[in-house]
């Protein structure tokens, strides 16, 4: 090992660094491993970076390091030992997963990338179930019927070491049943999660709560969404990764406890500006518009602390609510238009229209 590179020191730095400061530390570890041509750690730290981006930060940031990982791994396929193939498939999965959330990547490019990913799946005979979920989650915005057919392929395919946890899989099933308005099927899938008879990972039961909130709010039934929002508000605001969960809480709490919605908005604004993941941004900004639109009916201004890079930032942090409402509308509409242009559908704009409707049932 090169004397200028101490992997143990870097691992300790990474382990003891929390929050948004961790990603730059891992990048510096990658840079030094590259300089010293420590190929094991060039790969290992890239894997750590992709994992951190995927589960605690901005998922698309996993993509560049995953491509670099692929290049290095193909040159040095044995350096990671017997687990190398699994790490390779996993990091490429983390690179494929965010594409659905990046409207600037054309559908045809996604098709090419998912085909290459499937070749990797077959090469190592790992991740077949996950492959079908990747296909499914993209087609949700293109063709709901085909998306559900792909989900059925996913559900019937055997699990392996690449699979999400069983609770995540059930959350995926809940989402797909709600997508086709099969509330009874979703509720059946949700039973062991609601009774807490399953192990929970970083994203569960958050995914279930978010999808039920969105489903009921889209139906105009804030009363039915309320218990899920109260559950989610206590768990879903840890970091950038949670912006979609925060958006769901804001949207529902607007009609029950707008002060809580404002607290979530203020916290999330620190994370959402400049984020690569456009779906996280859409979910958050959509609900920010809902909140401002609702508040504009009863007051003209609002005091809220905004980050320095907010487009309408002023020294007093007192804002005209209609100005905020218009700003969020323009932001959401721009994101929705970009997704729909890429997907060749109107699913995002139709989703925004549902959010713009006042709930019919509140209490």
Protein language model regions, located:
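Generic helix N-cap/helix-start motif at coil->alpha-helix transitions
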Residues: 1-10, 40-44, 87-94, 124-133, ...
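Residue-level recognition of tetratricopeptide repeat
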Residues: 51, 137, 175, 214, ...
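Active-site/pore-lining binding-face segments in mid-to-C-terminal subdomains
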Residues: 224-310
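C-terminal non-catalytic interaction modules
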Residues: 270-363
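Solenoid-like repeat scaffolds
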Residues: 31-39, 70-79, 117-126, 152-164, ...
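Solenoidal tandem-repeat scaffolds enriched in leucines and small polar residues
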Residues: 115-188, 195-196, 206
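Non-membrane alpha-helical segments in proteins
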Residues: 7-15, 28-31, 40-58, 84-100, ...
